[in-house]
Amino acid sequence: MSNVPADLRYAKSHEWLKLEADGTATIGITDYAQSSLGDITYVQLPKVGAALKAGETFGVVESVKAASDLYAPAGGTVVAVNAELDSAPDAVNRAPYAEGWMLKLKLANPADANALLNAADYGKLLG
């Protein structure tokens, strides 16, 4: 069974979003996604300052099994990327909700997070 933290919001494309106290949102891929991909070998992320729209591709994650596009669960401006993933992409496998975070967004509309799935609904999606 995949780990689905209750304090996060989830996209059907298996990205998670955490609203932070400073109004930004931290984004990564779910435990289910990293488990399905297998050992992650490379993560391509956007540059700080990039503008993203909800549902738009923001990067790529490559594993021993496949390469998969990453989709923005909400729109906004990239204010930080996890540069540690350049040298340690396996952090996404080890801790997808902690050290394996991918980027931080200044949300264009914080209410966009409400359109995402809560933990219970995401759990149902996974079966």
From Swiss-Prot:
Q: Which residues form the signal peptide?
A: none
Q: In which domain of life is the source organism classified?
A: Bacteria
Its recorded name reads: Glycine cleavage system H protein
* InterPro entries registered for this protein in UniProt: 2-oxoA_DH_lipoyl-BS, Biotin_lipoyl, GCV_H, GCV_H/Fam206, GCV_H_sub, Single_hybrid_motif
Gene symbol here is gcvH
Q: Where are the N6-lipoyllysine residues found in this chain?
A: K65
Q: Give the species.
A: Opitutus terrae (strain DSM 11246 / JCM 15787 / PB90-1)
Gene3D superfamilies on file: 2.40.50.100
Q: Which PROSITE patterns match?
A: BIOTINYL_LIPOYL, LIPOYL
